[in-house]
């Protein structure tokens, strides 16, 4: 197939719309549903991300995309009981394969932002992964293939309208890419930088120069995730998965704050008070996500006040106080942080430290690199200058 007609472009008034190849065949096949313009932007960006994660780590990878940026990305490490519970997969009666674990991590890291996502899988989608996908509100999935059992499950989702896309894993695009803006054609070489190159971690200006193998792995995950995130962007990673992604901010510190707040929320969801919230039976997953988001934030009264809590809980929960939240966040350690460009000031490091960051990879090159390094040394953070910028637009 050389061309795929679309219902419309970014918005319903933008017609006609299509995706096509100037030479050769499209590398994708639509197995179910009718993907839209933004669906395909998400699909093709997310596929590149998971493909590179698999190449870099050797493990199955998954990503959850919304509006051409990842809400989550992860590799297939096993889930402990706590993570199973906060990702809402503790009730499944089947074994989680490595690919299913990667999907649960990617989809579960920022559940509010992943609502209505497009997901990507590095490996052939198996039945376990398809069964997890079927439970979530999602627009579609892209993968290099599907087992017969998985395809049956996914084709039943959304009454047969769920988008299922198969991509040729051997497809390699041309080295030059083009796009038009306001009738003007832009052309550039594809960003083919390898982010698992060991030389990226050789320039370590901080006093602490120790990166554990797990820290390097997590920093590579952060950098690959940022490569496909709208700039400016910052990514916090722990235990093989992104736990906070700040995308599309004009200010670097706002990226760091946004991603840090998401990382804090991921960690707060593991607080015993949150994990033991007395939800009513059969409450919708989206309502549960929203309640948790409010409960651990500054607007908890919206669900805890009389007349409100009865809608969601069997009994009125005790509040999670600011002091309790701060104390719990302080327990988070071993977090890795990547940035798609240099940190201009040390305030980014101050904010990152509050979310448990101990390892950083960033381009370097700010006129205030000295201040950034001094702030890292203040907290014993190991930081590498990669000398690689990862802007994405």
Predicted regions and their residues:
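Glycine- and Gly-Pro-enriched alpha-helical subdomains that act as flexible
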Residues: 71-112, 243-342
């Amino acid at each position: 197939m050389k061309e795929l007609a679309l219902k419309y472009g970014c918005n319903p008034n933008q017609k006609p719309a299509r995706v096509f190849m100037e030479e050769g065949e499209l590398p994708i096949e639509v197995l179910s549903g009718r993907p839209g313009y933004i669906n395909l932007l998400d699909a093709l960006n997310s596929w590149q991300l998971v493909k590179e994660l698999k190449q870099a780590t050797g493990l199955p990878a998954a990503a959850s995309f919304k509006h051409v940026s990842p809400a989550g990305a992860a590799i297939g490490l096993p889930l402990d009981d706590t993570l199973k519970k906060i990702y809402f997969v503790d009730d499944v009666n089947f074994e989680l394969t490595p690919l299913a674990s990667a999907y649960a991590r990617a989809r579960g890291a920022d559940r509010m932002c992943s609502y209505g996502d497009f997901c990507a899988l590095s490996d052939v989608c198996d039945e376990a992964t398809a069964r997890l996908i079927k439970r979530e509100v999602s627009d579609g999935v892209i993968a290099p293939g599907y087992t017969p059992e998985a395809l049956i499950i996914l084709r039943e989702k959304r009454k047969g309208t769920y988008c299922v896309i198969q991509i040729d894993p051997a497809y390699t695009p041309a080295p030059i890419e083009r796009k038009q803006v306001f009738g003007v054609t832009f052309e550039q070489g594809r960003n083919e930088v390898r982010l698992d190159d060991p030389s990226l971690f050789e320039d370590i200006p901080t006093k602490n120069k120790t990166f554990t193998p797990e820290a390097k792995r997590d920093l590579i995950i952060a950098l690959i995730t940022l490569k496909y995130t709208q700039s400016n962007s910052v990514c916090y990673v722990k235990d093989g998965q992104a736990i906070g992604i700040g995308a599309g901010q004009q200010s670097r510190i706002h990226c760091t704050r946004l991603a840090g707040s998401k990382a804090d929320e991921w960690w707060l969801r593991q607080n015993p008070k949150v994990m033991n919230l007395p939800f009513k039976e059969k409450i919708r997953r989206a309502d549960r996500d929203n309640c948790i988001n409010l409960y651990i934030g500054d607007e908890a009264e919206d669900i805890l006040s009389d007349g409100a809590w009865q809608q969601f809980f069997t009994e009125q929960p005790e509040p999670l106080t600011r002091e309790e939240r701060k104390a719990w966040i302080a327990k988070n350690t071993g977090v890795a942080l990547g940035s798609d460009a240099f940190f201009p000031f040390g305030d980014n490091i101050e904010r990152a430290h509050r979310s448990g960051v101990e390892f950083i990879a960033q381009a370097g090159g700010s006129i205030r690199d000295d201040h950034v390094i001094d702030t890292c040394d203040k907290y014993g953070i190991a930081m590498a200058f990669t000398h690689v910028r990862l802007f994405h637009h």
